[in-house]
């Protein structure tokens, strides 16, 4: 190809199309495709400088192509890398490029490599498009970049540094949203004049319009490109600015900038994957991308209505709608995809935090009936405690009643019912028992007769005391005394050291004591209290100290024994009289006269008469030998 003195080379080397040319030369029939595009000002110049600073530019793109080799796109990447390498070498010093070692190709032979490339790339997939592709490649004239509308360049005079408006499509990647794999396309929105300038020659049907689609044979079939162009025009005509965000993800036209880095590099899909119809697949994606979000919003509404009859705030629904647009406009590019995913995660976290806050508030509301339930539980526990307490109190009362019944059985003649009366009876009974114990502990042998005891104690049988049997104070309990019927009174001196001195009662003997008499006798020093004696006299009997006493039988004693007892009693009486005399002399008081009278009575009357001795001897014989006893008595006198 030559234009005057200028020329360029198009070589086919190792399956790659290599184009070499000089500065200020027009573009070849296949202008190189800028691998990095952009719309910013000065993008072309900066990209060429960046590539000049990278001596291994072609190798770098070869590496990129190797990365896409697993997807079956290595040949296309190598082709475009060759074109890019040519561009970067043309921007530098041409003396360093070994283009002069290649043969020169004339104009009539320029279409041969294009036809060969068409045959190589198109024969495997669409055989019906081989002829049309070859004719389009042969009829494509050299296109100058000045004829294309340039946007936002830095004012450089070199047309190669200006951004090239090309129609590029990304790899129809299969993005997974909720388990749904849908092929999507991603491109940048382009101003309307450039889009019309780039696409209208294609739709006009003229042969010159095919030059706009640079390397369309290597990227995808012409049918797919035409379908995407029509869908883009239909989307731009029907969508407004509000819905343009979701509609622009179908097909977009991009001005590729070389300084944008490898992340924005176009990913060329395999031609088999590109043969899928994009339009039927894109519409379900728009509907299914928003479908998983609708149940979440409805879930929040249902939760709001279920708890406490309230509805969730409206801003939560709006917050859930925001990720829908982000998901619908997600691209294949790793940078944009990562940003959109991060934004979606942030929105999701915000919604979860708001849902947790509302749940905590609802839990606070739910705690109010919980408080009632707790209070009900406490009241139940309280009633249960009271019930246990009542049961223990009932058992305690039962034990008290049982003890009171046992006490009632112990108290004689106790027919009280109430507890106070029973306790009074028990107190009186205990007092009586205490008095009896004190009298028994004195050692005087005095026993309280039953008539002096309380009614509750009259049935008691107090055993006889034999400590002092010589006093004759058996009181009818088996301790017999001598018969004193001939004497008018029996005076008993008080016992020395006795707690209850009992003065002798003149001329009387109590009933049942074995002492005959008709007078009364004061008992135990209580003045005015007398005991009438109306019973007949009982024959007296003698008692011996230390001998067993039997109330039913009469002891058999001889006359000598009776004399011994009499002498003993007289000696004891003399000793008692002497003691009383000494006490009367030592202390003179109003009671001394009475004591002196008692002492005189003792001296005069405390003697056993002969008649008593005779009777005792008769009783002692027991066999009718009383005459012998009387004879002995007379002899003794």
Curated annotation (Swiss-Prot):
One cellular-component annotation, GO = nucleus
What ranges does the record list as Polar residues composition bias?
149-170, 608-621
Protein name as annotated: Transcription factor PHYTOCHROME INTERACTING FACTOR-LIKE 15
Indicate where this protein resides in the cell: Nucleus
Where in the sequence does UniProt note compositional bias of the Gly residues kind? 35-46
Q: Which UniProt keywords apply?
A: DNA-binding, Nucleus, Transcription, Transcription regulation
- Ranges where the bHLH domain occurs: 384-433
Where does this protein have compositionally biased stretches of type Basic and acidic residues? 384-397, 628-637
Which PROSITE patterns is this protein grouped with? BHLH
Q: Which residues form a coiled coil?
A: none
Q: What is the lineage of its organism?
A: Eukaryota, Viridiplantae, Streptophyta, Embryophyta, Tracheophyta
- Expression induction: Down-regulated by light in dark-grown etiolated seedlings.
Q: Annotated region Basic motif: where? A: 384-397
Q: Which organism is it from?
A: Oryza sativa subsp. japonica
Which SMART domains does the record cross-reference, listed alphabetically?
HLH (SM00353)
Q: Which GO terms describe its molecular function?
A: DNA binding; DNA-binding transcription factor activity; protein dimerization activity
